[in-house]
Amino acid sequence: MGGIFDAFEVYNKKKHSSNPHMFGNTSNTGGTKTDYVYSSEYRAPKKNKLMKDELLAPDSEHADGAKAMLTESAAQAGTPNMVDLSKLSQHELESLMKDLRKGEPNNRVNF
């Protein structure tokens, strides 16, 4: 059982290594030296994060004009889609802004 002051501890030297006496009593130095990650400490990225990173990658197919509108897959997934506003027409820009504001509350105050 830990002491009463363990809750106020800023850095726990036993947290990042099964052998806390290795590398000068800590394996997480926080310096510019090479850090070591042991196999027990490695955690692979989650599949959801990998899928989001793939959707955020720039796509040349959606680079200009009407093709720059939100795609159905991106809109359904709820992930952002990069749009070049300088290549949109006025009508495309207005429809995009209206789609982005859908479901937004009306906070107007009339005096």
From Swiss-Prot:
Pfam families registered for this protein in UniProt: SPG4 (PF17325)
InterPro entries: Spg4
Domain of life of the source: Eukaryota
Role, per record: Stationary phase-essential protein not required for growth on nonfermentable carbon sources.
Similarity comment: Belongs to the SPG4 family.
UniProt protein name: Stationary phase protein 4
